Amino acid sequence: MAVTKLVLVRHGESEWNRENRFTGWTDVALSEKGRAEAQQAGQLLKEEGFVFDFAYTSVLKRAIHTLWNILDQVDQQWLPVEKSWKLNERHYGALQGLDKAETAAKYGDDQVKLWRRGFAITPPDLTKDDERFPGHDPRYANLKPEELPVTESLATTIERVIPYWEEVIKPRVAQGEKVIIAAHGNSLRALVKYLDNMSEETILELNIPTAVPLVYEFDENMKPIKHYYLGNADEIAAKAAAVANQGKAK
């Protein structure tokens, strides 16, 4: 049976991850730790013998720079890369820029968990005159007005991620190309939910650690056979737990 592999990687720690702030579509750089995490991810992929044919990422530099660091480690800087806003992090609306722990202290841990992890629950909207509204950003100049979010849930994130997977990425994987996707916690949760046919309740508890390669193996019909992280299991579990705890009051 022919097996095709796909690698998913959440970006390394960003400056706002480090500061425990809601980020969303805000274009925040990797922290020094995040760059090191991305390089380590590249080393793991190199040690496992991964060689890629194509890469996808978002239009946000924390994901782009994670991909750059990975490709540097596997010596494939020349690899063709397609960037799409459809792989962006979920838009966190008016929460973008706020401290997660302070927000939890104000509204309660349960409310913040619902905003962060609830399937169809959206954070408070931005207004379109807010400087954080993506309509003011030139990288989104070609988007239709209805494509510019003022907030998003995981459900609405799925509505942009899955068509992009089905129409753009999946055909490459299906023809045997080795693809890597460097994206974000929620755009990857959207894809994982779809690939694994996860329930809304199960996805609520799924936390994707920063910069740990997640490998999916597919059969000839593009059905997932199995998936697994590369790296030390205890370290990966600790990273996932840290992600889960970000939205709690101190």
From Swiss-Prot:
Alphabetical list of Gene3D superfamilies matching this protein: Phosphoglycerate mutase-like
NCBIfam families linked to this entry: pgm_1 (TIGR01258), PRK14115.1 (NF010713)
Family: Belongs to the phosphoglycerate mutase family. BPG-dependent PGAM subfamily.
Swiss-Prot/TrEMBL keywords: Gluconeogenesis, Glycolysis, Isomerase
Superkingdom of source: Bacteria
Site (Transition state stabilizer) residue list: 184
Protein name (Swiss-Prot/TrEMBL): 2,3-bisphosphoglycerate-dependent phosphoglycerate mutase
Species of the source: Photorhabdus laumondii subsp. laumondii (strain DSM 15139 / CIP 105565 / TT01)
Enzyme class: isomerase
The reaction(s) this protein catalyses: (2R)-2-phosphoglycerate = (2R)-3-phosphoglycerate
